[in-house]
From Swiss-Prot:
Gene Ontology terms, MF aspect: ATP binding; cyclin-dependent protein serine/threonine kinase activity; metal ion binding; protein serine kinase activity; RNA polymerase II CTD heptapeptide repeat kinase activity
Cross-referenced PANTHER family: CELL DIVISION PROTEIN KINASE (PTHR24056), CYCLIN-DEPENDENT KINASE 5 (PTHR24056:SF46)
Subcellular location: Cytoplasm
Gene behind the chain: CRK2
Protein source organism: Plasmodium falciparum (isolate K1 / Thailand)
GO biological process: cell division
Name assigned to this protein: Cyclin-dependent kinase 2 homolog
Amino acid sequence: MEKYHGLEKIGEGTYGVVYKAQNNYGETFALKKIRLEKEDEGIPSTTIREISILKELKHSNIVKLYDVIHTKKRLVLVFEHLDQDLKKLLDVCEGGLESVTAKSFLLQLLNGIAYCHDRRVLHRDLKPQNLLINREGELKIADFGLARAFGIPVRKYTHEVVTLWYRAPDVLMGSKKYSTTIDIWSVGCIFAEMVNGTPLFPGVSEADQLMRIFRILGTPNSKNWPNVTELPKYDPNFTVYEPLPWESFLKGLDESGIDLLSKMLKLDPNQRITAKQALEHAYFKENN
């Protein structure tokens, strides 16, 4: 830690406190001090193993992890620093992003996701706050793999409930089979939010989250989602909703954009498009 000075707290995330700091050469970094659940037990070896995997992720659309500082009681991750995140940008862009910007960000997001999925690394906690942006319009994914390294918390340490808005319906219904499809669902939610300017499914509880999804996409059944009835939190008494037309809740997204989004937001995870397939979609072949 002696290498870094001028610590300025810039945020408090799911896993700890984030500081902006400089090294002795004047370069700026983001230092993430990880809170350890049981300080007397030190850092689990599984966590160290997961973090070491993150150090190997080298891609222009993933925030670089430069260094890991760990002592008996403390773990500090040293990341590259970017000025802004997508959530802050959406907060000031009423009515959503320009279509060319949304497309560029989605392309970069999918590139980063495809790279990680190729290496069997899941994010598990994708949301606009985890997508950092610089002045050149580059998007980089932050906190990759941390959800696996530290476990997905139900609450933030500040007692703020971790957002459910980007969580897939299979996970909400208790599926333990985490695969790349949970990240694709989150990407779809983020895509819709970039287009509309507001979250697509802003639920306040797990039950409310599911109902918001069903109200728009329709209530699943064993015809359109085989084995859905076997999920732990599936309820045969779910209110039955018919799916709405995509155009009714998406402003200004063209036909190919709607087609891509509909393939990301499939209720059945086995029917969702992969990141690699999404990158080949006609939506990215058009000029805006």
